[in-house]
């Protein structure tokens, strides 16, 4: 455990009853509660949002908040405060979420609606330049010729934060499994900063606060480089991070060596969690103190996985970087 922060008591209260959903600790970590919407809640939500196709949510951004309110109302208005409490709690900051009855690629639009409702109870999802929408769907196949590790199946996608090549702060990341065929492996990998045994060493290094250049490959549809330090602090002085090894561009030998050592220290951490995410489930994490990645897949000629992501900002609290807004 890192000396800079201490884990508080787990916020998951197994004795508390919620309306419309259940909440239990996940099998992987007490930092990662698992929230499940009941079958009745799921069915009633889908019935009440059926009049709006996904295209309506794309064109009319206020509808994203409307579907969020519908879901929260179905949960007796207990959902929104629970989501915010968990995501902003440094001891947790993450959820594994699913809805009973949503578990097939034929329900892809319903998955987008559900994830959109949840995300817009805590904030707003940013424009995703890769897709041109507030969310992005992408497919991983057995053979890939893209310009980043996002879709490459036979190697580990290293741990990183999202939103590293854009100017907006990315407070949260939502990652949903839409489809999976002929898949073995490929678990989500997560690392909480306070479980990273080398955090003190790198957070206190002179290069930790030096602005560095981040540049995205062409597939991201972002042409402007951004500059910021890898580490910063939140409002309480605790370490937060904004880093991805693929896109950071060291300007000299000193930065290059330090970044290489940083990457090795992250990837070899004993605090990494391996989390299976079945079709229909999604992870929702605080992007400022959780890093995420993906384990490798076992090769198969018909391998296919489709994912959906949303990433955005919290609208109900300011937990941004303090020295490099």
UniProtKB/Swiss-Prot annotation:
InterPro entries from the UniProt entry: GlaH (IPR015038), TauD-like_sf (IPR042098)
An individual GO BP term: L-lysine catabolic process
Catalytic activity, EC: 1.14.11.64
Pfam families: CsiD (PF08943)
Pathway: Amino-acid degradation
Cofactor: Fe(2+)
Reactions accelerated catalytically: glutarate + 2-oxoglutarate + O2 = (S)-2-hydroxyglutarate + succinate + CO2
Residues involved in Fe cation binding: 160, 162, 292
HAMAP family noted in UniProt: glutarate_hydroxylase
Function recorded in the entry: Acts as an alpha-ketoglutarate-dependent dioxygenase catalyzing hydroxylation of glutarate (GA) to L-2-hydroxyglutarate (L2HG). Functions in a L-lysine degradation pathway that proceeds via cadaverine, glutarate and L-2-hydroxyglutarate.
Quaternary data: Homotetramer.
Protein name from the UniProt record: Glutarate 2-hydroxylase
Name of the gene: glaH
